[in-house]
C-alpha cells in the first residue's frame, strides 16, 4: 500500500511550509485543518491553488502542509512555493510552465528593520533647516 509521495519546502517572508503531495482527490490540509478553515480569505486560497492551475493537475493530489511563522499572506505564499517544488518531483516537465508563471522563484522580500533615531524603517521626523 505504499503510495508515491512528493515533498517540497516553500518559504515566503517569515513563513516556512513543508508540503507533501499524495495522489488523491484534491483535498488540502494545513496544520491538520481543512484549508477553508485554516485560511479564511478566498483570494489566498486561490494563491495556494495556482501551481495546480498552471500544470492542469487540479484535483489529482491530496496536499498535506505543515506551516509555521508569518501571517496568512506569507503562509499562503510559502504553501504555493512548496506545492510548486513538489510538483517538480512529480514531473520535471512542469519546470518550464511553473518557472514562466514565477512559482519556483523564492520571493526574497522581507520586512526591513527599524533603524534607531527613525520612527519606522525609513520614516524620519520632519527636517527643519533652521
Curated annotation (Swiss-Prot):
Keywords tagged on the record: Ribonucleoprotein, Ribosomal protein
Family matches, as Pfam families: Ribosomal_S9 (PF00380)
HAMAP family listed in its UniProt record: Ribosomal_uS9_B
An annotated Gene Ontology molecular function: RNA binding
Protein name, entry field: Small ribosomal subunit protein uS9
Keyword Glycoprotein attached: no
Organism: Streptococcus sanguinis (strain SK36)
Family according to the record: Belongs to the universal ribosomal protein uS9 family.
Source superkingdom: Bacteria
SUPFAM superfamilies in alphabetical order: Ribosomal protein S5 domain 2-like
One GO cellular component, as annotated: cytosolic small ribosomal subunit
Renumbered residue ranges of the record's region Disordered: 107-130
Record-linked PANTHER family: RIBOSOMAL PROTEIN S9 (PTHR21569), SMALL RIBOSOMAL SUBUNIT PROTEIN US9M (PTHR21569:SF1)
Cross-referenced PROSITE patterns: RIBOSOMAL_S9
Gene Ontology biological-process annotations: translation
Gene: rpsI
Classification lineage: Bacteria, Bacillati, Bacillota, Bacilli, Lactobacillales
Residue ranges with Basic residues bias: 111-130
Family annotation (NCBIfam families): PRK00132.1
Amino acid at each position: 500500500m505504499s503510495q508515491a509521495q512528493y515533498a517540497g519546502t516553500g518559504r515566503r517572508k517569515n513563513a516556512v511550509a513543508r508540503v507533501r503531495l499524495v495522489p488523491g482527490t484534491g483535498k488540502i490540509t494545513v496544520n491538520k485543518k481543512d484549508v477553508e478553515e485554516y485560511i479564511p480569505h478566498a483570494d489566498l486560497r486561490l494563491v495556494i491553488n495556482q501551481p495546480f492551475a498552471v500544470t492542469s493537475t487540479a484535483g489529482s493530489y491530496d496536499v498535506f502542509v505543515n506551516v509555521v511563522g508569518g501571517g496568512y499572506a506569507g503562509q499562503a505564499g510559502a504553501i504555493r512555493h512548496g506545492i510548486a517544488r513538489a510538483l517538480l518531483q512529480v514531473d520535471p516537465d512542469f519546470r518550464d510552465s511553473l518557472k514562466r508563471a514565477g512559482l519556483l522563484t523564492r520571493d526574497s522580500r522581507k520586512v526591513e528593520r527599524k533603524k534607531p533615531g527613525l520612527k519606522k524603517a525609513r520614516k524620519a521626523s520632519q527636517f527643519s533647516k533652521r
